[in-house]
């Protein structure tokens, strides 16, 4: 068993629950978006801006972004821990992934609240 402080959850069960919870959030978000596209009729710029400007859509989008961050981090941590044995390389890859995920969420936050 690897005991490393870079895991997101406290233990494997906690990570398991986080991954399942974020998967549910992402599934609900996909259903929400597909439902919008299926029921919106003609999709114009005004319709799209109106949809993106609603508070519910903004909050749900941010929740989905944070869910992607958590889901991806736990998954990548598990893959890197299992398959990349040199510690320096694994830590460097983890750092790159964390920075990319944080930049992704910050950029998403700016885009969502910029509408």
UniProtKB/Swiss-Prot annotation:
**Which terms are listed as keywords in the entry?**
Cell inner membrane, Cell membrane, Electron transport, Heme, Iron, Membrane, Metal-binding, Transmembrane, Transmembrane helix, Transport, Tricarboxylic acid cycle
Gene Ontology cellular component terms for the protein in this record: plasma membrane
Give residues annotated as binding heme. 71
User: One biological-process term from Gene Ontology?
Assistant: cytochrome complex assembly
Ranges of the Cytoplasmic topological domain: 1-15, 81-90
Entry-linked InterPro entries: SQR/QFR_C/D, Succ_DH_anchor, SuccDH_FuR_B_TM-su
The GO terms describing molecular function are: electron transfer activity; heme binding; metal ion binding
Q: How does it sit in the membrane?
A: Multi-pass membrane protein
Taken from the record, one Pfam family name reads Sdh_cyt
Name the principal localization, coarsely classed. membrane
Hey, which stretches end up on the Periplasmic side? 37-58
* Membrane-spanning intervals of the chain: 16-36, 59-80, 91-115
- State its cofactor: heme
* Cofactor remark from the record: The heme is bound between the two transmembrane subunits.
Q: What does this protein do?
A: Membrane-anchoring subunit of succinate dehydrogenase (SDH).
Q: How does it assemble?
A: Part of an enzyme complex containing four subunits: a flavoprotein, an iron-sulfur protein, plus two membrane-anchoring proteins, SdhC and SdhD. The complex can form homotrimers.
Report the protein name in the record.
Succinate dehydrogenase hydrophobic membrane anchor subunit
């Amino acid at each position: 068993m690897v005991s490393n402080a870079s895991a997101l959850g406290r233990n494997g069960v906690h990570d398991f629950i986080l991954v399942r919870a974020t998967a549910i959030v992402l599934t609900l978000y996909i259903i929400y978006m597909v439902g919008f596209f299926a029921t919106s009729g003609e999709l114009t710029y005004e319709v799209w801006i109106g949809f993106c400007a609603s508070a519910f859509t903004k909050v749900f989008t941010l929740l989905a972004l944070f869910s992607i961050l958590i889901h991806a981090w736990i998954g990548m941590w598990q893959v890197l821990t299992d398959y990349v044995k040199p510690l320096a390389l694994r830590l460097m890859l983890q750092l790159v992934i964390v920075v990319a995920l944080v930049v992704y969420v910050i950029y998403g936050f700016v885009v969502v609240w910029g509408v």
